[in-house]
Amino acid sequence: MSISMTTKLSYGFGAFGKDFAIGIVYMYLMYYYTDVVGLSVGLVGTLFLVARIWDAINDPIMGWIVNATRSRWGKFKPWILIGTLANSVILFLLFSAHLFEGTTQIVFVCVTYILWGMTYTIMDIPFWSLVPTITLDKREREQLVPYPRFFASLAGFVTAGVTLPFVNYVGGGDRGFGFQMFTLVLIAFFIVSTIITLRNVHEVFSSDNQPSAEGSHLTLKAIVALIYKNDQLSCLLGMALAYNVASNIITGFAIYYFSYVIGDADLFPYYLSYAGAANLVTLVFFPRLVKSLSRRILWAGASILPVLSCGVLLLMALMSYHNVVLIVIAGILLNVGTALFWVLQVIMVADIVDYGEYKLHVRCESIAYSVQTMVVKGGSAFAAFFIAVVLGMIGYVPNVEQSTQALLGMQFIMIALPTLFFMVTLILYFRFYRLNGDTLRRIQIHLLDKYRKVPPEPVHADIPVGAVSDVKA
């Protein structure tokens, strides 16, 4: 049974809303905290790291809660709605820190940022957990996932292109007010897009659709054991963490790089927004690319193209030649690579859910995607921490002309660090990841045979008692 266009577009629009709401945090929150609120880079970097350590605990717990959920609306939809509404409120508060001062301000920043991460987890885990429940077919997943990734990328590029102009226009001399008002626009898109997704996207091959609910009674300890027993999930965790650290260093530091190293913050939109077209074209043609090439080749491209992007920026620095065309080329290389990565990662997590059911006899969509959410936020936090540490070491001072040492350190942050982490991702994939070719086909044939014996109705899951005992061991 093929997936309808209504399902694909509705799922895609939901991704647009949620990534529109999170993009401002990944791209501009550190800038807002340091250059608008006036917090030290050390405080901000430490906060981001502590929050992500908490997420390492909180995300699997949320995955466990979602896994145990049974309702008339399905396993995932109630949490998507609850998380969207809660995260919308916290997002507005997150960009209200400029209204406070002193100790009150620091406490407010810490509390709201940690709550932001928790509430985003509530909706993000079940949102992506829908992928393996919509279809088991490999090709259908490769055709479905580009839709949410396309709209998510579109949201990111819109955020990069319009945030600062909106903030400057609405806020004028008060950038804090401009950021605060922009969050209201994001929240409106967030809520409307979520409602559309909830109405038109349905669970079919969920663990809800098996004859018993044994899987919903797994203990938290057993759930954590699932993560470590699933070797392919552990491999993906390492790859995705390295990739997210690299890409978040670039996106999080780009505003600093263009402001101080290149010396013209107005060139920043050229780097991200103009490259958006290449990113979106990549997503549109992904099904054809993966069919004519292979996932292995596309993963290599996802890792190598951003390194070439860093090379272009390095060449510009060495030549002291800041050319718009070269900036656009660097942005295109980066965004084509990240487009391939995000589609492949979502598909790979769905495959890993199948692999977990095949190997451990337990299907836990929300657990696998809780790890994905943890890694995405962890990559953002580690990137911010690395940026903060290096900025502190090189003597960075906001809103002034930087020293030669500081400019050299900024080159290290923007070019050397991401290159290192992209290479780690590439090595891990070719050394340890195995869900390709015949292995993947064998798993999916096994599961299709299994589900043909069970009508795809919203009845409870059949998890063998022996399998649960094995996981708990």
UniProtKB/Swiss-Prot annotation:
GO terms for biological process: melibiose transport; methylgalactoside transport; transmembrane transport. Keywords: Cell inner membrane, Cell membrane, Membrane, Sugar transport, Symport, Transmembrane, Transmembrane helix, Transport. It comes from the Bacteria. Changing D19C: Abolishes transporter activity. Can bind Na(+). Large decrease in the affinity for melibiose in the presence of H(+). Belongs to the sodium:galactoside symporter (TC 2.A.2) family. Monomer and homodimer. Mediates the transport of melibiose and other galactosides by a symport mechanism. Can use sodium, lithium and protons as coupling cations, depending on the sugar substrate and the cationic environment. Alpha-galactosides (melibiose, raffinose, p-nitrophenyl-alpha-galactoside or methyl-alpha-galactoside) are cotransported with either Na(+) or H(+), whereas beta-galactosides (lactose, L-arabinose-beta-D-galactoside, D-fructose-beta-D-galactoside, methyl-beta-galactoside or p-nitrophenyl-beta-galactoside) are cotransported with Na(+) or Li(+) but not H(+). This is Melibiose permease.
